[in-house]
Amino acid sequence: MIRYKAIISYDGTNFSGFQRQPQVRTVQEEIEKTLLRLNSGQAVKIHGAGRTDAGVHAYGQVIHFDLPQQRDLEKLRFGLDTQTPDDIDVIQVEQVADDFHARYQKHRKTYEFLVDLGRPKNPLMRHYATHFPYKVDFSVVKAAIKKLRGTHDFTGFTASGTSVENKVRTISRATVEKDDKTGFLIFTFTGSGFLYKQVRNMVGTLLKIGNGRMPIDQIDRILESGDRSLAGPTAASNGLYLKEIIYDD
């Protein structure tokens, strides 16, 4: 068997997430249906680096899969790209070592989160940015987000009921920028891994701090206590993008 790695992007609006689930449309299912056709009716399972939730988008999701024969890489990419639905794009395909694993190989992920501060909101971006029609002190958000950098136990920023035991993660980049032209806030987080709904919970908390309904040092309290109830609400999924995955050499 030959192992292939692919970089894909997708519009998450009409997907119930990346991972295959019964009776709903998922990214994994659509790509596996295409690979079934390209592999003469033989089933092919794909493995993704990140399991994005319903409504979450991706610029640079990474998958791997095995095929029984060597393929021309561009023809394989083209076949996948043209035979998957229009809301999936296959950007690149390459052959990798047999032991490469998209999820378990050591890597860093970068997520981006777009917040539309417009009043009224931009209707053309309703599926691609989370609307927050309240005042936000940008300087306060900028100060608060710095507290998330470094290695911490992020228990207070994950969804309750998660089965992951070790909730210590390292965030190497946590920034926020303001696009004065669009009125959007652009949050960027890079880390060694993220817990379930962690990014959305961090953004929801930062927006509440920026709106003056939480103090900046609330971040410290959440990190120290691990108490989810101290954090802000979970931001909607439509503003979240899996931007890039970089593997260690």
Curated annotation (Swiss-Prot):
Which family does the record claim for this protein? Belongs to the tRNA pseudouridine synthase TruA family.
Name of this protein: tRNA pseudouridine synthase A
- Gene3D superfamilies annotated for this entry? Pseudouridine synthase I, catalytic domain, C-terminal subdomain (3.30.70.660), Pseudouridine synthase I, catalytic domain, N-terminal subdomain (3.30.70.580)
Enzyme class label: isomerase
Q: How does it assemble?
A: Homodimer.
Tree of life domain: Bacteria
Enumerate the Gene Ontology biological process terms.
Answer: tRNA pseudouridine synthesis
